[in-house]
């Protein structure tokens, strides 16, 4: 029993250490201090170009997986493919914004969808590892992000670029059999980490 508790504690510590390293936020260029005094920042998401797992593009991944599911059961792959895309609006983005806005409460800044904000955050997904959960075997999700802070009136004018690599996603307790749940946790952690980073710069 003592050995089990010890091993479990080590595992939790290792996960925590891994998450801490993986969530490092790197400012590639520019300065986010322009957000000081702002009440809102517009937010947009870009999924136009990213790899998934061992696949170079999302299209390759979706075509392969949906074909495999359809072979097992007619229509299952099409349903799965739609769910994969719908998870962006239904799961990923709400999680990102919830944790980002919670982290920015002290500074009085809120991410919004609209045209009123002076600056816009463009959250670009660059790579997704969906992970898996099969019985007692599991692999957490991980997502790479490139986040541009631009002027809303002229989005070609980049104010800052922030990168986050291998942001982990998974639920403690192992109830994340759905890849969408695991990936959503990566977005939640990314939103929280971004808010923490910006807070320190304002």
Question: Predicted regions: what is each one?
Answer:
Residues 95-106, 193-201:
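Structured segments of extracytoplasmic/periplasmic soluble domains
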Residues 25-26, 108-157, 169-177:
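Surface-exposed short loop/turn segments
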Residues 73-86, 153-200:
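Short secondary-structure boundary motifs at beta->alpha junctions and helix caps
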């Amino acid at each position: 029993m003592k050995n089990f508790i010890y091993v479990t504690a080590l595992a939790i510590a290792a996960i925590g250490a891994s998450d801490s390293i993986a969530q490092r936020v790197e400012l590639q260029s520019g300065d986010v201090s322009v957000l000081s005094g702002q009440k809102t920042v517009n937010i947009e998401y870009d999924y136009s170009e990213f790899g998934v797992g061992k696949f170079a593009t999302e299209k390759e991944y979706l075509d392969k997986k949906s074909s495999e599911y359809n072979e097992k059961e007619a229509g299952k792959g099409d349903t799965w493919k739609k769910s994969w895309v719908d998870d962006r609006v239904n799961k990923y983005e709400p999680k990102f914004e919830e944790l980002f806005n919670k982290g920015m409460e002290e500074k009085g800044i809120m991410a919004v969808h609209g045209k009123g904000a002076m600056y816009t955050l463009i959250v670009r997904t660059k790579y997704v590892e969906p992970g898996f959960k099969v019985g007692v075997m599991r692999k957490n999700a991980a997502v790479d992000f490139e986040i541009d802070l631009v002027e809303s009136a002229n989005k070609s004018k980049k104010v800052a670029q922030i990168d986050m690599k291998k942001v982990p996603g998974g639920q403690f307790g192992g109830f994340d059999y759905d890849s969408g749940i695991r990936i959503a946790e990566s977005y939640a952690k990314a939103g929280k980490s971004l808010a923490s980073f910006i807070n320190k710069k304002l």
